[in-house]
Amino acid sequence: MLPAANRMRRSDEFARTFRRGTRRGTRRLVVHAATTDAGEPPRVGFVVSKAVGGAVVRNRVKRRLRAVLMHRVTDLLPGTLVVVRALPPSANATSAELERDVDGSLTSLGLRAKVVPAR
């Protein structure tokens, strides 16, 4: 489970990330990122709309994305806000595909404090 200190919950954090941040996307997802005070821990949020599928499918996608980010939140720079927005093709994606997409987006945004070796 993603630690409570690393979860984004407030709508103003989501709005700030979407408005002021940068983004990188793939066929399955878009990663939005913004920075805040360096003293704060990195925080992550997820957006999975009804366009992705029904409730069961959306929750499965969210679980997979949370699992991917749970292991990467320690690699993020302090003060980073990250929102992962799932697109409809993510409904049929495997965990490995989502992992590759998230890793590629985080790396291209330059958000990692340390690089995780590819599997």
Curated annotation (Swiss-Prot):
The keyword RNA-binding applies. One of its GO terms (molecular function) is ribonuclease P activity. It is an enzyme of class 3 (hydrolase). It holds the Pfam family Ribonuclease_P. It catalyses: Endonucleolytic cleavage of RNA, removing 5'-extranucleotides from tRNA precursor. Its EC number is 3.1.26.5. Keywords: Endonuclease, Hydrolase, Nuclease, RNA-binding, tRNA processing. It comes from the Bacteria. One of its GO terms (biological process) is tRNA 5'-leader removal. RNaseP catalyzes the removal of the 5'-leader sequence from pre-tRNA to produce the mature 5'-terminus. It can also cleave other RNA substrates such as 4.5S RNA. The protein component plays an auxiliary but essential role in vivo by binding to the 5'-leader sequence and broadening the substrate specificity of the ribozyme. NCBIfam families: rnpA. Belongs to the RnpA family. Consists of a catalytic RNA component (M1 or rnpB) and a protein subunit. This is Ribonuclease P protein component. It comes from Beutenbergia cavernae (strain ATCC BAA-8 / DSM 12333 / CCUG 43141 / JCM 11478 / NBRC 16432 / NCIMB 13614 / HKI 0122). The lineage of its organism: Bacteria, Bacillati, Actinomycetota, Actinomycetes, Micrococcales. The gene is rnpA.
